[in-house]
Amino acid sequence: MSNLSVNAIRFLGIDAINKANSGHPGVVMGAAPMAYSLFTKQLRINPAQPNWINRDRFILSAGHGSMLLYALLHLSGFEDVSMDEIKSFRQWGSKTPGHPEFGHTAGIDATTGPLGQGISTATGFAQAERFLAAKYNREGYNIFDHYTYVICGDGDLMEGVSSEAASYAGLQKLDKLVVLYDSNDINLDGETKDSFTESVRDRYNAYGWHTDLVEDGTDLEAIHAAIETAKASGKPSLIEVKTVIGYGSPNKQGTNAVHGAPLGADETAATRQALGWDYEPFEIPEQVYADFKENVADRGASAYQTWTKLVADYKEAHPELAAEVEAIIDGRDPVEVTPADFPVLENGFSQATRNSSQDALNVVAAKLPTFLGGSADLAHSNMTYIKTDGLQDDTNRLNRNIQFGVREFAMGTILNGMALHGGLRVYGGTFFVFSDYVKAAVRLSALQGLPVTYVFTHDSIAVGEDGPTHEPVEHLAGLRAMPNLNVFRPADARETQAAWYLAVTSEKTPTALVLTRQNLTVEEGTDFDKVAKGAYVVYENAADFDTILIATGSEVNLAVSAAKELASQGAKVRVVSMPSTDVFDKQDAAYKEEILPNAVRRRVAVEMGASQNWYKYVGLDGAVLGIDTFGASAPAPKVLAEYGFTVENLVKVVQNLK
């Protein structure tokens, strides 16, 4: 029976990829046995309740092998993955896109495809489960109690981010993380002996992982036994499973020819004969469906029913926790953060926005027990520390400060995993110039609709002495170009509070907070509520103004000072604070016209960053005071003066407008 089911997985993959004339059959054919063993013997999921909070998670880190996952979901009974959807693999509007997409297809726990990010994201799942278990489980009531399983390939383990995350997972002793390594000695360009020769198991042992080897990737009992041993090891586990890529293909198995191209009609026919598969394309024997129903769907439904009874009993036994747990199960925050939670700030108060951010995040932390995060070894520079808590580790699982180490990319993927798991609000910080290291993870935050908060400090050339390696220039423009990411560069402590409030109440959009090291003064015109519009008027000296200054962050203070100087000379000036171009661009035409009237063409945008994205606001008649070269090393006042960010120079720029 098991051999029939394994071959059903293989041929669903082969046939769908042939029909699409696009895809990666090799991993489907080689990894089918380990995936079958995992789904039918270990994985606890309920296809009728795909979002069950306590389900085991499965991450196909080798996302190019998506037909392996779609075949498993179809056979397991997930309604989203019908046979029609299998036949529509990689087609417009289908539930079976080229790489798995979270939120698009039920049963997909994470978007994967960029190699290395899946296994790294899985680390976040495991850490989320551990925190929620420590927070809410009570004796006899293990409400949060599940494993995170991964299938990865050689390519995943070549990527640096997987090494970052594996080092972190070993340090944290995330013992409910089990990785099956599809070790087939082949990559797209040829054999791994030409590019990847170290002992992966030795490396993972050094990280503090349990490791094992299954020498025959078709030995279902050996795979099952290895997983059982891994679960009892007390460590994260990597099981190397030696497989043959394209298993069963007489002329292509074991070669890179089967990695990323359809088998084609002739080789498919030969493979059918070699594996004894006497069925037509997309024909699956009923006994295969029965096998998956009994060993995946029915087993999972039974586990779900047992768990729902446990939750009901838990609510009676622990009513003080019941409301919070119920909210988490329903996909809500256990406590609502409101604007009233933040203290009212006086005009003239001076503080670096990184410090304002720490004050704001501690307001959130005091209100929301499932709010946690950290920094890539810069907590005392990024100001990301929750003051009431210590560091989280295996013996202090309830603490909410996470020390990610100098692992920016892994930090982003781990945050994504924690957000994907559900039940948590998470954040992570680093210097803004190092946002490039984490950007690929930020992109997957945005693509998956995860409300992760990224805290980026030391936001401009005002860093000064550290020089151009640490002074962001192009970074704001780059992040603003990303779909579904809200970038906030607040002008002062008041706007920083508002940005944090919007970040932790966002449902499907991540947030990047771009913050200063230097002090900024709270302007009289800044407004907590208006930050939600992305831009608003902070200063105006005449109703019939004919000049608009648009500024963000630290340059709002500069723009207001310049406007007052211009006003003293008889000019009629409006200053607009634009903490988020992304949010402002989503406002209706009437609001945009209210803030930036089309009739007023004398406009100057002021920002210590690349100028390119400001021309859509100032037009051909306006000007941009920005930076389109790299920074320099000197005391900050000298650097700012040399780059023209002074009241005198800004006044001159305005006066030079036609």
Predicted features along the sequence, with ranges:
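Conserved acidic/glycine
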Residues: 1-31, 151-152, 156-157, 178, ...
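Cofactor-binding active-site loop characterized by glycine-rich and histidine/acidic residues
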Residues: 30-172, 385-386, 418, 525
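Flexible, small-/acidic-enriched active-site or ligand-binding loops
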Residues: 470-473
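Short glycine-enriched loops at secondary-structure junctions
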Residues: 89-95, 375-381, 388, 406-409, ...
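A glycine-rich helix N-cap at a beta->alpha junction
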Residues: 78-89, 170-182, 205-209, 446-461, ...
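A short, small-residue-rich loop immediately preceding and capping a beta-strand
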Residues: 20, 56-57, 108-111, 141-159, ...
